[in-house]
């Protein structure tokens, strides 16, 4: 039986209205068990200032972003279930949900799925990688009862 260990950190000044820990756990469990038996992930919910600072430091982009993924890379001789950290910006997730005409819950779920796939080594820099990752995200989201997260883009509602 697979196991997903979640360390949830709320660093947002307003914790009201955030998804519950069980929601984050469920979203991780929708992704990770198909890739490895035991997984440990830290999810840190932050405000725009921290997101902007981290995005600028690690990606050279001076603006907040929806999710940052920091994969853990253990030395080859050390086997640990730690996948890494997801840093998710509450305000950006809520703003994007409104812009993309999604429920906030749906977009939170998508950001957890998207970030988890980055922790597993998926990327979307090249078009072919993006297509593979987006197809996998869609499959996972639909398996959890959510709509295709890229439907708005496909329908021309967003960039």
Swiss-Prot record:
The keyword Zinc applies. Zn(2+) binds at residues 114, 118, 124. It is found in: Cytoplasm. GO terms for cellular component: cytoplasm. Binds 1 zinc ion. GO terms for biological process: rRNA processing. Its EC number is 3.1.-.-. This is Endoribonuclease YbeY. The lineage of its organism: Bacteria, Pseudomonadati, Pseudomonadota, Gammaproteobacteria, Enterobacterales.
């Amino acid at each position: 039986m697979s196991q997903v260990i979640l360390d949830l950190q709320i660093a947002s000044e307003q914790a009201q209205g955030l998804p519950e820990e069980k929601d984050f756990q469920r979203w991780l469990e929708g992704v990770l068990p198909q890739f490895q038996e035991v997984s440990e992930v830290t999810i840190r919910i932050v405000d725009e200032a921290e997101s902007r600072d981290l995005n600028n430091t690690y990606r050279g982009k001076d603006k907040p972003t929806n999710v940052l993924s920091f994969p853990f890379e253990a030395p080859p001789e050390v086997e640990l279930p730690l996948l890494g950290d997801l840093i998710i910006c509450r305000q950006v997730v809520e703003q994007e949900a409104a812009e993309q005409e999604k429920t906030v819950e749906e977009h939170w779920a998508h950001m957890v799925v998207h970030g988890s796939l980055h922790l597993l080594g998926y990327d979307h820099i090249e078009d072919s990688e993006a297509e593979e990752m987006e197809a996998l995200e869609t499959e996972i989201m639909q398996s959890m009862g959510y709509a295709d997260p890229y439907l708005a883009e496909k329908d021309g509602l967003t960039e």
